[in-house]
Amino acid sequence: TWIMAVDTDSGKRIPFGKGGAPSATIADAVCASYGVPFWCPPVTVADRTYIDGGVASPTSADLLADSAVDEVIVLAPMASRQPDQPRSPLMKIERRVRRYMTTIVDREVALLEKSGKRVIRIEPNAQDLNAFGYNMMDPKRRRQVYDTAQITTAETVRMAIG
C-alpha cells in the first residue's frame, strides 16, 4: 500500500510505503496525505512537512508504469470525462479544475497503457458530479453523495471494465 503526499520543501511526490520512501507509520502517512490546502494544515513527519498528494496528481497512477503489474485500477474522483454545462458560477469553476485534473489522469493512463498495462478507469458520472456539488469537501453533502453512489457505482464499474 502506498499513500501519496507531497513534500512541501521539494515539491516531490512521496509514496509512503514504497521502498525508498521516507519511513512513516500508516497513521502518519494518512495524516500527511490529508493536508489539503485551505482545508487541513500540512503535517510534519520526521522533520519534513507534507500535504495531500492530490496537489501534484489526482491519482499518481503513473508511478506504476515501471512496475511488474499487468493491470491497474485507477480510481479518479477528481477527474471526469462527463460533458456537462453547469450554470452556477461556482460549478463552472469546479469543472475547470476537474478538467485540468482529468488531463493529468489522461496522461497517466496513456503512460500506463504505453507500458503494456491494462487500465480500468473509474471516475464520477454526471449523477455523481451533481451530488458532489462544487465543493467535494462539503460535509452536508455526504449523505447525498453516498446515496447517489449506491445507485451509480455498479453501472460505473461495469462500464469501466467493458
Protein language model regions, located:
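Patatin-like phospholipase
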Residues: T1-G162
